[in-house]
A protein has these predicted regions:
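RNA pseudouridine synthases
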Residues: 1-273
Length: 273
């Protein structure tokens, strides 16, 4: 109670109020990448929305998982991905976890990394795209506009390919997280451009080949990566909404990794999809 006197070294337990699950629980095959008492991180497949109210979404599958595992909490997403974007989706298990990890996102200590395939050959090995963006007049897509909110998208080129008709597979990457490895903060310049996570396949594109890039997102505007690369003349492969040639496949964007500081232990955690 407010009248209780506490001393240094005392252990205090806080009972979190039970909450009603706010989405209809629907059984779904979730690929869980990481879980602790405060967070759940899953690998979102292509073709599924995160939390649409008018159709079955990932939120329904998470609600079912919570129900089956006795997690009496609302589903709180800390990030969003477009329907056809795959990879790391982060869910907080409490309001406290949501608040603390959202603060990390706001100050960019919660890192969000993506892998993308873009049309054409990107000349710069790396760059930081700082652009103002807002929703366009049609209400469907977003655009670079001086009146918009400033965004920052950093990228580093992983590999460049000339045009050859081969398979696509960024969204078919092997999903894994090795929790036994030392968690490290990987900077753009330290990326192994020939490592196992780099997709070597080639896409159909009427433009001169395509480029594979590693992207770090510093802000979270809707369609930010798609708009940024379209603005510099290299839309994501297959992203017809933003000017790419049709390929018959979803656009190529994967939320490849998140890096954050554990809210209880202070340990730096890396989770890879």
């Amino acid at each position: 109670t407010p009248k209780d006197v506490i001393s240094e070294g005392d252990e205090i337990w806080i009972a979190m109020a039970k909450e009603k699950i706010d989405y209809e629980p629907i059984e779904m095959d979730l690929h869980i990448l990481y879980e602790d008492d405060d967070l759940l991180i899953v690998d979102k497949p292509a073709g599924v929305t995160v939390n649409s109210k008018d159709q079955v979404s990932l939120a329904n599958g998470v609600a079912y998982y919570f129900k089956e595992n006795g997690i009496k909490r609302k589903v709180r997403f800390l990030n969003r991905l477009d329907r056809d974007t795959t990879g790391c989706i982060v869910i907080a298990k409490s309001g406290l976890a949501q608040s603390l990890y959202q603060q990390q996102m706001d100050d960019n200590t919660f890192e969000k990394w993506y892998m993308a395939k873009v049309e054409g050959i990107v000349k710069a090995d790396e760059d930081s795209l700082v652009l103002p963006m807002e929703r366009s007049a049609d209400g469907i897509h977003y655009e670079v506009n001086p009146k918009g909110k400033e965004t920052r998208t950093d990228y580093s080129v992983l590999c460049r390919h000339s045009s050859q008709p081969v398979d696509n597979s960024v969204n078919k990457s092997q999903n894994s997280v090795d929790m036994s490895q030392e968690n490290v903060d990987i900077e753009l310049q330290n990326v192994d451009k020939h490592g196992a996570n780099v997709d070597k396949s080639v896409h159909n594109s009427s433009k001169c080949g395509y480029t594979e890039v590693l992207v770090r997102l510093y802000t979270g505007k809707t369609h930010q990566i798609r708009v940024a690369f379209s603005h510099i003349g290299h839309p994501l492969v297959g992203d017809t909404l933003y000017g790419a040639q049709p390929t018959g496949q979803p656009f190529q964007l994967r939320a490849q990794k998140v890096v954050f500081t554990h809210m209880r232990t202070g340990e730096r955690i890396t989770v890879t999809a």
